C-alpha cells in the first residue's frame, strides 16, 4: 500500500540546502505580518512605558527633606576603618 504525502526528507517551506524560507512560506506568512507587528509593539510598549515612568518618578525624588544625623569624627573614622577592613578581607 502506497503512502500519500510528501517524500521523506522533503520540506516545501524550507530550501533543503540553505534552509531559507521559500516563496511559498513567505506567501503563507504574509497575512499575519501586520497583526504580529502590532502585537509585538503592544507587548513591548507596556513594559517600556512602566520602565520609563519609574525612571522618571525616581529622577524627581528628592532626599533633601531627610535629615542626616550628625556623626562625630571619631565615629566616622571607626566606620571608615570597619568598611576598609571588610573591603580588604573580601
From Swiss-Prot:
InterPro entries in UniProt: Coa3
Spans through the membrane: 32-54
Keyword Transmembrane helix included in the entry's annotation: yes
GO biological process: mitochondrial cytochrome c oxidase assembly
Location in or out of the cell: Mitochondrion inner membrane
Keyword NADP listed: no
Entry membrane topology: Single-pass membrane protein
Keywords: Membrane, Mitochondrion, Mitochondrion inner membrane, Transmembrane, Transmembrane helix
Positions on the Mitochondrial matrix side per record topology: 1-31
Gene Ontology CC annotations of this record: mitochondrial inner membrane
Regions of this protein lying in the Mitochondrial intermembrane compartment: 55-90
Subunit structure: Component of 250-400 kDa complexes called cytochrome oxidase assembly intermediates or COA complexes.
Function: Required for assembly of cytochrome c oxidase (complex IV).
Annotated family: Belongs to the COA3 family.
Protein name: Cytochrome c oxidase assembly factor 3, mitochondrial
Organism in which the protein naturally occurs: Debaryomyces hansenii (strain ATCC 36239 / CBS 767 / BCRC 21394 / JCM 1990 / NBRC 0083 / IGC 2968) (Yeast)
Gene behind this protein: COA3
Amino acid at each position: 500500500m502506497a503512502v500519500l504525502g510528501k517524500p521523506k526528507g522533503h520540506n516545501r517551506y524550507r530550501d533543503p540546502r540553505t534552509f531559507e524560507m521559500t516563496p511559498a512560506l513567505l506567501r503563507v506568512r504574509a497575512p499575519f505580518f501586520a497583526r504580529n507587528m502590532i502585537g509585538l509593539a503592544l507587548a513591548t510598549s507596556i513594559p517600556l512605558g512602566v520602565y520609563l515612568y519609574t525612571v522618571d518618578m525616581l529622577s524627581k525624588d528628592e532626599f533633601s527633606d531627610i535629615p542626616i544625623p550628625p556623626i562625630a569624627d571619631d565615629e566616622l573614622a571607626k566606620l571608615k576603618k570597619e568598611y576598609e577592613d571588610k573591603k580588604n578581607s573580601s
